[in-house]
Amino acid sequence: MSILLPNMAEFDTISELEEEEEAATSSSSPSSSPSSSSSSSVSGPDEDEEDEEEEEEEDEEEEDEEEEEEEVPPPPRVVSEEHLRRYAPDPVLVRGAGHITVFGLSNKFDTEFPSVLTGKVAPEEFKTSIGRVNSCLKKALPVNVKWLLCGCLCCCCTLGCSLWPVICLNKRTRRSIQKLLEWENNRLYHKLALHWKLTKRKCETSNMMEYVILIEFLPKYPIFRPD
């Protein structure tokens, strides 16, 4: 027993040391908790400030991107059609040369080749196109004249209603000439940068209106010009 007592004493001292360590740790834990709370309280505003700075930087980056998107380079300069037409030559008028005119539409157009069209279109093609228009008028105008005479004779009895047939016939004649000119344009003249159309103009000798053939010069677009 004398031998075991020292060993038991050692065991007692070890257990006492363990109890003292546990007491020390328990006493240190409350003291450390305020420090941690204070550190968290101190670190909290710093983190908020950092978050605000990051948000401001993101907002600035978004604004910079929007400004870059808004500052798009201007589109390439394009020449407008009105600008090209302004510098085009004046159109050519082909007036009526017949001895009968019904509601401003003569029974014949002048077949003389205008000098302005020299180098633009062949005189033979010009005379052929005018000949087609004159042949259309030659067929339609005599019928219109007959209906006009009948309408004038019966005008008093019908209160002017007898003039409606000749008005409709004259409108149909104009439409047939317009279709003929469109066919001529698609066939030849658009390729030569010309455009034929039937339009109204004042007479040279009076203030009355008459139908003439207007030959316009189409603008040539600069297709080889860089953007």
From Swiss-Prot:
It holds the Pfam family Erf4. Keywords: Cell membrane, Coiled coil, Cytoplasmic vesicle, Lipoprotein, Membrane, Palmitate. InterPro entries: CHIC1/2, Golgin_A_7/ERF4. GO terms for cellular component: cytoplasmic vesicle; plasma membrane. The keyword Coiled coil applies. Expressed moderately in the brain. Belongs to the CHIC family. This is Cysteine-rich hydrophobic domain-containing protein 1. It comes from Mus musculus.
